[in-house]
């Protein structure tokens, strides 16, 4: 799947106080090798005394390896990740089902150099998911508990779904579904904002820094929420597989097959749904 990002400095409208304060960027790099393309800046390998790892078992029997690459903040961050992991695994499994990797590796880096070497991310990124592991940047320590819960759920969904996600999948839909798994519910935007929200985003919108990207993520999320509310959560999963999986259909055909309705019909119903007063 292509790289996708969420701006660190943008605010997500319509989500209430919890997400209004979200400042940390979460990135998904499914399908990429663990080492980024090109030659990263030289970075020293952590020594055996600096690096440490431990393995835990979550409630469903999956194992989680928590790996610290040294520094004073990585272990406290991993403690927080450990406390949030059961909830994240349960949220992903509730939506996706139990058939996804049983072994999860989470790495906390101590420097921007380490993060770039492992995941290709910059200093404005909190986490990255490669085909093998979820990597947290040093800046992730600034996340609130609510933000960490959202980022971990979001990244873990991408990790769980990576084998069923094509490289050319519509990224706006993969991100919308990941946010459906990760983000808490919020009141409907109402009639005044419905016309602005009820437009399907494009992948190009996700790549446009600023309000365009913020609105694109909101639109994708609201669309997935509508599909789950109107057609059922299993139908949203079917839509993901038909629109984003290997040998996927285009979005219009996938909607018709997964939801049993024409895309235009679905969009009209979506606008009406958004216009409701909660």
Q: What function would you assign to each model-found segment?
A:
Residues 36-50, 106-112, 132-138, 177-184, ...:
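Short, mixed-charge, low-aromatic patches
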Residues 129-133, 146-151, 164-278:
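Acidic/His/Gly-enriched intrinsically disordered linker/tail segments
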Residues 32-34, 93-98, 221:
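Short, surface-exposed loop and linker segments with low hydrophobicity and enrichment for Pro/Ser/Thr
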Residues 1-59, 278:
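N-terminal low-structure segments adjacent to metalloprotease catalytic domains
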Residues 52-170, 188-189, 248-251:
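Juxtacatalytic substrate-recognition/specificity segment
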């Amino acid at each position: 799947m292509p790289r996708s990002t969420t701006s660190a400095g943008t605010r997500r409208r319509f989500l209430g106080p919890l997400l209004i304060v979200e400042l940390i960027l979460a990135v998904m790099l499914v399908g990429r090798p663990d080492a980024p393309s090109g030659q990263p800046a030289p970075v020293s390998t952590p020594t055996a005394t600096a690096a440490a790892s431990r393995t835990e078992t979550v409630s469903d029997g999956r194992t989680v390896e928590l790996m610290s690459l040294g520094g004073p903040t990585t272990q406290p961050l991993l403690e927080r990740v450990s406390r949030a992991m059961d909830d994240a695994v349960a949220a992903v499994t509730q939506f996706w089902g139990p058939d996804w990797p049983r072994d999860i590796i989470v790495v906390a880096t101590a420097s921007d150099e380490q993060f770039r070497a492992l995941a290709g991310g910059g200093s404005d990124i909190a986490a990255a998911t490669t085909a093998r592991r979820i990597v947290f940047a040093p800046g992730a320590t600034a996340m609130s508990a609510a933000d960490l819960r959202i980022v971990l759920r979001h990244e873990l969904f991408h990790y769980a779904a990576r084998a069923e996600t094509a490289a050319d999948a519509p990224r706006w839909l993969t991100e919308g579904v990941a946010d459906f798994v990760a983000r808490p519910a919020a009141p409907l935007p109402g009639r005044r904002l419905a016309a602005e929200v009820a437009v399907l985003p494009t992948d190009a919108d996700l790549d446009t820094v600023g309000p365009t990207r913020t609105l694109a993520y909101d639109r994708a999320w609201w669309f997935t929420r509508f599909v789950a509310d109107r057609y059922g959560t299993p139908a949203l999963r079917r839509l993901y597989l038909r629109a984003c999986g290997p040998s996927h259909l285009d979005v219009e055909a996938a909607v018709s097959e997964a939801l049993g309705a024409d895309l235009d019909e679905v969009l009209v119903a979506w606008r009406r749904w958004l216009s409701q007063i909660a």
